[in-house]
Amino acid sequence: MSHDSEPQPVTATPGGPLNGSLKPPGDKSISHRAMILGLLAIGETQVEGLLEGDDVLRTAAAAKALGAQITREGEGRWRIVGVGIGGMQDPDGVLDFGNAGTGSRLMMGVVGGQPVTATFDGDASLRKRPMRRILDPILKMGAEIVSEAEGGRVPLTLRGPREAIPIRYELPVASAQIKSAVLLAGLNAPGTTTVIEKAASRDHTERMLHLFGAEVTVTPSGEGGHGRTVTLTGQPTLRGTDVVVPADPSSAAFPLVAALIVPGSEVILRGVMMNPLRTGLITTLIEMGADIERLDEREEGGETVADLRVRASRLKGVDVPAERAPSMIDEYPILAVAASFAEGTTRMNGLHELRVKESDRLAAVAAGLAANGVTHAIEGDDLIVTGNGQAPAGGGTVATHLDHRIAMAFLVLGLAAKSPVTVDDGAMIATSFPSFRPTMLALGARIEDGAAA
């Protein structure tokens, strides 16, 4: 799917309660990593529940171009035959990642640690996103940049070494993408690669490396044990395995918040990943008074999952600490929507990382709130939203800036605001939640093509 085509406006209109049960799409983070580790493993990897959104399909295409055999065997069911560490081939063409920041950055770690040369590119949004933080440690490990756009952006050609150099690297910010890129490059390094993070970020790469047979240790470190030291023993033999992809908590966030703010709603979300490094939004919403019940907690694909029963709730404003940001970095747009229905002020602290997402997400959220009559302010890197416990006015048109999460968040606002809300382009929702529209319609939502009449 091209993100350079004509915009497709979409409008959400307030209506009756939302009711029903759904399984949100497979987790995007785990889907990317399943493709990448399947490429690097020896033998066959079977994936169930893969997210078949544009981002993950771009990563699958890149893995295929680097030598993996990849077959789709049914909905969400994929078979990958890998080439092993050191067995990749130079791709014939450019690796076009579209809008996929995660896929492109993780694959830079893979290419930067192996004896291949590849050119990375993407859409207009990806071309604006900074890659230097990913590249800095990879260059220390022996990779070379053959060519790059200004400021270390794509299009960018990267050449990896015969063997990577093992390093000890302290992350400048809590970032699962940087950590993962270093660990993936370290797979082809003799000896030990160590990553130190001041605050724990998503740990899917560590969990999945372990699942595929790598030796990874994680120990608490830093002030109060909030940080992590991750150590990888290089040049393991990764073995193909079965991966069951749990439902993505970042995608579940949209129907979840919709059920909280549309009066009379009750929705069950099935099989949602409950990894504590991904559930900051649920923790915050419960603090705000949300009626969210965990049912049938169980293990799937190395992760804890649960069914969530969500009922419409009266919410109150809360203070969200900055250290919670890594566990909910993608959920602030939808949290801002929930906060606009709450009684009182919600302050979201330390959101600097939102400025380098698919859009300047902080500015995009603020503009969307302004367009729909929500009282808010930005103070430094903090977002402050004040509600009166009633539905906000709505009636606005929101500029999405090619950002799928901005589009979905403000469509959810439109389901419970006083007047319909239009997003200027809904095409990129397919990036992470291709079935968003039919899923929401099945619950009783009113979401239609075109601008509000």
UniProtKB/Swiss-Prot annotation:
Keyword Amino-acid biosynthesis: yes
Binding-site positions, phosphoenolpyruvate: 28, 101, 129, 177, 361, 405
Catalytic activity from the UniProt record: 3-phosphoshikimate + phosphoenolpyruvate = 5-O-(1-carboxyvinyl)-3-phosphoshikimate + phosphate
Binding positions (3-phosphoshikimate): 28-29, 33, 175, 177, 330, 357
Role description: Catalyzes the transfer of the enolpyruvyl moiety of phosphoenolpyruvate (PEP) to the 5-hydroxyl of shikimate-3-phosphate (S3P) to produce enolpyruvyl shikimate-3-phosphate and inorganic phosphate.
CDD domains membership: EPSP_synthase
Pathway: Metabolic intermediate biosynthesis; chorismate biosynthesis; chorismate from D-erythrose 4-phosphate and phosphoenolpyruvate: step 6/7
Subunit structure: Monomer.
Region (Disordered): 1-27
Keyword Phosphoprotein belongs to the record: no
Keywords for this protein: Amino-acid biosynthesis, Aromatic amino acid biosynthesis, Cytoplasm, Transferase
PANTHER family for this protein: AROM/DEHYDROQUINATE SYNTHASE, PENTAFUNCTIONAL AROM POLYPEPTIDE
PROSITE patterns: EPSP_SYNTHASE_1 (PS00104), EPSP_SYNTHASE_2 (PS00885)
Subcellular location: Cytoplasm
Protein name in UniProt: 3-phosphoshikimate 1-carboxyvinyltransferase
One of the record's GO cellular component terms: cytoplasm
Coiled coil: none
Molecular function GO terms recorded: 3-phosphoshikimate 1-carboxyvinyltransferase activity
GO BP of this protein: amino acid biosynthetic process; aromatic amino acid family biosynthetic process; chorismate biosynthetic process
